[in-house]
């Protein structure tokens, strides 16, 4: 067997190397998540948690929860909110729909708790997003400057969750975004996608202005919510409550991101329908959000370079075998192995920084799957009736 080293092989090998390097340098996982520290540390001697950082001027907070036909989840997670260890006044405002008898029964169990306040929305309220209406009613019931929006399908991992979020509520800030992980019962690819998206948004926030909120915890100022007339600018869209708030309210240097262990929520595994709808509704919502083109270009570039490099490597192996350019074949195989190994290590390192446990053997395949996953949902979205994404048909 003759080893052929010709000009075409050298040029092709150089192009392959450049493609692999470019794909690696644009990998979202290359910059791992920067974790915020837990606000408290445990002392083994006396089992008492004390402040490990300078004292914070914790503000009074109203936590708004908007369950709809989720009495079981409310019963499981409401006690975790009511038992938060927080040095300032706080109140849990639960907004539910009149006629939800199971939710009403759950609230009666905790009615004696001074931190709980419940109100309802009449059945006659129509023609707008249930969630947006419930949040607006909760805001009207609040008496504090800082509001904390969260979902009943999520639970705090610690009784110091509220401390972790509220320590960022300083004079110069107007938004605090909290990280949310899926629980271990959630399929691995969904957990991978949540981590990928959250990390991408963190990096975007670090470079300037937050684009949207992927998680289920968002702090904002009540005065600003009222000044901007709440959801008036996006009232007709059924979903995207947190996304629209962040997209409209965020400004450089005024948004904090909380992702410590204490400050991270754990979300129950969503149903297949809820999972599909979340992405489909986001595809509609982003058409009406600012900075969408700037938000998408890094993801599109990274995915394009990844797939282009893999296709080029596989094509080089095939072409080299057909033309007996065995040096080119060996070089392409080496670069392909290096790509898989290096990207797996980079991804595993980033996921571990987010407390996300994934099998290393699947990570490269998950990265490759992202493009096809989004393309499949693009097809679903373009086939969907666009009136399904709004509250009043136009």
Residue ranges and their predicted role:
Residues 112, 118-125, 130, 134, ...:
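Long helical/loop segments within the catalytic core of UDP-sugar-dependent glycosyltransferases
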Residues 79-125:
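Acidic donor-binding segment of Leloir-type glycosyltransferases
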Residues 169, 175-197, 226, 232-297:
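Catalytic donor/gating beta->alpha subdomain of glycosyltransferases that bind UDP-sugars
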Residues 135, 147:
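Short aromatic/hydrophobic "clamp" motif used to bind/position activated sugar donors
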Residues 151-167:
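Acidic donor-binding/catalytic loop of UDP-sugar-dependent glycosyltransferases
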Residues 59-62, 91:
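Cell-envelope/extracellular polymer assembly enzymes that use nucleotide-activated donors
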Residues 305-387:
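Membrane-embedded multi-pass helical conduit in multi-pass membrane proteins
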Residues 1-52, 347, 374:
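N-terminal membrane-anchoring/stem segments of glycan-assembly enzymes
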């Amino acid at each position: 067997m003759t080893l052929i080293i010709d000009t075409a092989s050298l040029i092709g090998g150089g192009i392959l190397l450049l493609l692999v390097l470019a794909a690696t340098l644009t990998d979202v996982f290359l910059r791992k998540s920067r974790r915020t520290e837990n606000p408290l540390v445990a002392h083994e001697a006396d089992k008492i948690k004390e402040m490990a950082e300078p004292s914070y001027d914790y503000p009074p907070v109203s936590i708004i929860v908007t369950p709809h036909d989720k009495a079981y989840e409310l019963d499981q997670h409401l006690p975790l909110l009511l038992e938060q260890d927080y040095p300032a006044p706080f109140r849990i405002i639960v907004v539910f729909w009149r006629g939800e008898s199971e939710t009403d029964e759950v609230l009666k169990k905790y009615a004696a708790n001074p931190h709980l306040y419940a109100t309802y929305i009449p059945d006659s309220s129509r023609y707008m997003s249930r969630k947006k209406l419930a949040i607006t009613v909760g805001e009207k019931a609040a008496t504090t400057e800082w509001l904390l929006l969260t979902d009943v399908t999520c639970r705090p991992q610690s009784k110091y969750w509220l401390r972790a979020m509220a320590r960022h509520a300083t004079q110069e800030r107007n938004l605090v975004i909290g990280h949310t992980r899926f629980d271990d019962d959630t399929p691995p690819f969904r957990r991978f996608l949540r981590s990928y998206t959250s990390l991408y948004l963190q990096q975007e926030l670090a470079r300037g202005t937050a684009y949207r909120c992927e998680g289920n915890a968002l702090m904002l100022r009540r005065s600003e919510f009222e000044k901007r007339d709440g959801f008036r600018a996006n009232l007709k869209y059924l979903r995207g409550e947190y996304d629209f708030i962040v997209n409209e309210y965020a400004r450089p240097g005024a948004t904090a991101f909380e992702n410590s262990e204490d400050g991270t929520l754990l979300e129950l595994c969503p149903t297949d329908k809820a999972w599909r709808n979340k992405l489909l509704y986001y595809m509609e919502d982003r058409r009406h959000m600012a900075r969408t083109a700037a938000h998408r270009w890094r993801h599109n570039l990274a995915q394009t370079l990844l797939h282009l490099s893999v296709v080029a490597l596989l094509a080089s192996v095939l072409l080299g075998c057909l033309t007996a350019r065995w040096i080119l074949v060996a070089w392409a195989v080496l670069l392909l192995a290096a790509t898989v190994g290096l990207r797996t290590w980079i991804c595993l390192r980033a996921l571990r920084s987010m407390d996300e446990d994934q099998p290393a053997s699947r990570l490269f395949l998950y990265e490759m799957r992202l493009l096809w996953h989004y393309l499949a949902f693009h097809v679903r979205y373009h086939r969907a009736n666009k009136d399904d994404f709004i509250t009043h048909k136009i």
